[in-house]
């Protein structure tokens, strides 16, 4: 999801 990546990068990608 959008909050999965560090500092809401790109859908955890």
From Swiss-Prot:
Keywords: Neurotoxin, Secreted, Toxin. Expressed by the venom gland. It comes from the Eukaryota. One of its GO terms (cellular component) is extracellular region. It is found in: Secreted. The keyword Secreted applies. Its main location: secreted. The keyword Secreted applies. One of its GO terms (molecular function) is toxin activity. Belongs to the scolopendra toxin 1 family. This is Scolopendra 4511.92 Da toxin. It comes from Scolopendra angulata (Barbados giant red centipede).
């Amino acid at each position: 999801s959008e909050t999965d990546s560090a500092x809401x990068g790109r859908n955890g990608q």
